[in-house]
Amino acid sequence: MRLNTLSPAEGAKHSAKRLGRGIGSGLGKTGGRGHKGQKSRTGGGVRRGFEGGQMPLYRRLPKFGFTSMKSAVTAEVRLNELTKVEGNVVTLETLKAANILTKDIQFAKVILAGEVKSAVTVRGLRVTKGAKAAIEAAGGSIEE
């Protein structure tokens, strides 16, 4: 068996009906669109969210919240990712050099996920309580 010899089982595929090709086809003349009306015309149809003139749901509900732009430049770093860094000092620059963070990240926070095996010094990063305890238990330290 080769990839170029594969084909669907006999009768598994139905060919689509061609629209507007005579009354004998079953989908001639109006081509399944019915008679007249907005949906029968070329380019016809109502916009997304339109409810026939009734006040649509997206306008009935109040606006709320916003998207913080800070989230685009902030990242979380897992404990097990700290072992991928060269040396035993972890900073924002060393995390970027190890391809753990992208170049546009400006803030990072170490979170308790996975485990840290070696003693590392975390410098200039925010650290959660659980992650701080795990780093210090492994013999590491946190510097501001």
Curated annotation (Swiss-Prot):
Biological process terms in GO annotation: translation
Residue span of region Disordered: 1-53
Bias type Gly residues, positions: 21-31
Keywords associated with the record: Ribonucleoprotein, Ribosomal protein, RNA-binding, rRNA-binding
Gene Ontology MF: a single term: structural constituent of ribosome
PANTHER family in UniProt: 50S RIBOSOMAL PROTEIN L15 (PTHR12934), LARGE RIBOSOMAL SUBUNIT PROTEIN UL15M (PTHR12934:SF11)
Family under the similarity heading: Belongs to the universal ribosomal protein uL15 family.
The protein's role, per its UniProt record: Binds to the 23S rRNA.
Assembly and binders: Part of the 50S ribosomal subunit.
Entry protein name: Large ribosomal subunit protein uL15
Native source organism of the sequence: Haemophilus influenzae (strain ATCC 51907 / DSM 11121 / KW20 / Rd)
